[in-house]
Amino acid sequence: MKLLERERADLERYLPGLDGLLAETSSAELERPGSPGVKMFRDAGGPALVIPIEYKGLGADPVAAVRIQRAIGSRSPSLAVATTMHHFSVSSLVLLAAGGGNEWLLLEAIASQRMLVASGFAEGRPDGRILAPTMTATVTDEGLRVSGVKRPCSLARSMDLLTASVIVPGTDGQGDQLGVALIPSTDLGVSVTPFWASFALGGAESDQVTVDNVLVPNDLVVPTGPADGAHLDEIQTAGFVWFELLMMGSYLGAATALVERAIAVDRVADSEKLTLVTGVEAAMAAVENIAHQIPDGQRDERLLADALLVRYAVQDAIAAVVPRAVELLGGVNFMTSDDVGYLAAAVNGLSFHPPARAKMAGPLMEYLTGSSLRIA
């Protein structure tokens, strides 16, 4: 068995030909703005990956999904990060459809038409209030008039739909609640402008999306949970679990790409190689443990707490493994190929995704002493 063999086999099983295309395309091409990676993913049927077969999807379970993200991350970190945002958005729609909603119609359209869904939820907010709405919404007889800005927004230039968090009137008539507005990218009120300036993850299309007074019909607005900005309902909890799971797999893939290069170097001692492999494989085992629990426990805050603890442990594993892999690869590899330096930079992205460790230290310790989990 080779490192990443299992993950690449799952990628080939669900999205035939994609791994080969990514492998034969240079990292420089895949990681630049305007990367062909997103189109490759779409053409391979990737938008349907986590959509159940009953909704015309491919029906990948959480374990297969996270392995596939790791495989993609080892070829193109940008593509792995970008597609995680699609899968995260779709997974929430799957849960809503399972509750008897009409979301199944949208899921069938996403799967059959290979539509990409971008997430307009509050990543990258300096105040850290990641559950607070990213958009303002005004109630009208026809639906909601939505306006706002999301930056960065992965898949900004390839998306077919944007999911945006908004405040909507409560279904029980008692106050407001959070909701998700589904906004077609073709609406004249939706525009995309440059935002991402870093060389790292440039292929993820993480630019600015502006929504200007877009009318969203009521049937494309889905109430989700409380509007207090801290506590989650079951749908939000499950969405966060999926988000953390797939992001961990994506960045572990990028880290493993460096390990894969290092263990191929003859002069590196077996003991050093084993240390690198142990680091990434132990981290992946912890991630897969979360994935195995998702079918029965994804709505449970306990699993989300476990996912966050594993996520911060994965960050530490990456921080330990990657510098050592770069050192063992040596100066010649670093100087003669951009790939080593690029991967070493890209893996740091995991620590920037919400919720940050420093923000969650207090809430997690409160949770571990008996309080409900809140998201900071």
Give residue ranges: language-model regions.
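Buried hydrophobic positions in well-ordered alpha/beta secondary-structure cores of metabolic enzymes
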Residues: I68, V146-G148, V211, A255, ...
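Generic structural signal for well-ordered, non-transmembrane alpha-helical segments
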Residues: P16, G253, L274-M284, L308, ...
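C-terminal helix-coil-helix/basic helical segment that borders enzyme active sites and/or dimer interfaces
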Residues: D19-E29, I263-R267, A282-D316, P323-F334
